[in-house]
């Protein structure tokens, strides 16, 4: 194959954002891929990923399910396609993909599971996504790092550019702006553009022809870096599910078959990253007629026994476009 043919060839990669709830927190399945030559695990986590094999995979989704199980010994349940990532210059794991000099186009998927089952696969772990985006968790109030770390850094970046500061202010709810939990991807990409995301320095060095070391966290406030552009893909997945729970009942893909309304609220709060008003949340659930009482109680609540419910999955046939509005708990 000629050099020009090689440089214009394309390899399709598949990446999975697999989300579960564990101990009240949203967690994501991560892997540490091994170097193709040294067989040493990466110092940074990434998402489960692998190449699409048109000879062996009938569809993208089947290919995704196959390599996620192979890498993590975990079987995916609910899956939906997220986005296609194909920007030139992406720091993609070429050796692991067998890509050589080919352009890598990644198709991202979102997977939801009710249980963060320990995979027992080496270099695989469930990690709280707040480790990667610590500014996204408002369940216990406004994160101090927004005003103590991010605001000063973004002001230095914006300088005298009013437009850039306006973008940062609106994205991160600075100077009185209102927080929008769905703008996860916009916030990460703004940090990347400002050079505050550690992956940005790595990618700039590579674009200049250098062989940079893996990025390290510049500050805990900026989140743990990931391999390739996997943190961008993860941000896309978080944005998607935060928006989708409001118009599709996908949150029930994260719930067991039987649950209490308190457990349902904690799950929604873990995903949305904001505290909800208990009574108003229950009114929303009752109004949408999404759940049905089982006439039994869960005694394992640490307090007064609570009624058990189930998701009325049969309602999807009549009302597929429904979700849960978020009645926020105001200060």
Predicted features and spans:
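Conserved Nudix-box catalytic region and its N-terminal flanking loop in Nudix hydrolases
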Residues: 25-74, 82-88, 244-269
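Acidic, metal-coordinating catalytic segment for phosphate/diphosphate chemistry
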Residues: 1-15
């Amino acid at each position: 194959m000629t050099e020009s043919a090689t440089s214009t060839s394309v390899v399709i990669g598949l990446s999975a954002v697999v989300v579960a709830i564990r101990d009240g927190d949203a967690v994501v399945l991560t892997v540490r891929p091994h170097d193709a030559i040294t067989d040493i695990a990466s110092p940074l986590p990434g998402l489960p990923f692998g190449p699409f094999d048109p000879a062996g995979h009938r569809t993208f989704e089947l290919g995704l399910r196959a390599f996620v199980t192979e890498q993590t010994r975990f079987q995916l349940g609910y899956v939906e396609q997220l986005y296609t990532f194909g920007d030139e210059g992406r720091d993609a794991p070429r050796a692991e993909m067998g890509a050589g000099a080919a352009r890598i186009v990644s198709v991202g998927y979102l997977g939801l599971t009710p249980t963060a089952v320990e995979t027992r696969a080496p270099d695989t772990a469930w990690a709280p996504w707040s480790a990667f985006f610590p500014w996204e968790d408002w369940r216990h109030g406004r994160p101090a790092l927004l005003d103590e770390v991010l605001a000063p850094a973004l002001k230095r970046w914006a300088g005298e550019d009013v437009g850039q500061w306006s973008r940062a202010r609106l994205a991160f709810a600075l100077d009185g702006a209102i927080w929008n939990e769905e703008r996860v991807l916009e916030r990460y990409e703004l940090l990347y553009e400002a050079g505050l995301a550690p992956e940005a320095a790595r990618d700039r060095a590579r674009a200049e022809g250098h062989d940079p070391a893996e990025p390290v966290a510049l500050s805990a406030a900026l989140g743990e870096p990931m391999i390739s552009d996997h943190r961008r893909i993860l941000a896309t997945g978080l944005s998607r599910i935060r928006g989708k729970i409001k118009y599709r009942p996908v949150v029930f893909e994260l719930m067991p078959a039987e649950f209490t309304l308190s457990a349902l609220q904690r799950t929604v709060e873990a995903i949305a990253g904001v505290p909800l008003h208990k009574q108003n949340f229950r009114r929303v659930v009752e109004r949408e007629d999404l759940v049905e009482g089982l006439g039994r109680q869960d005694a394992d609540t640490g307090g007064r026994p609570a009624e058990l419910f189930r998701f009325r999955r049969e309602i999807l046939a009549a009302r597929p476009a429904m979700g849960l509005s978020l009645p926020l708990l105001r200060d």
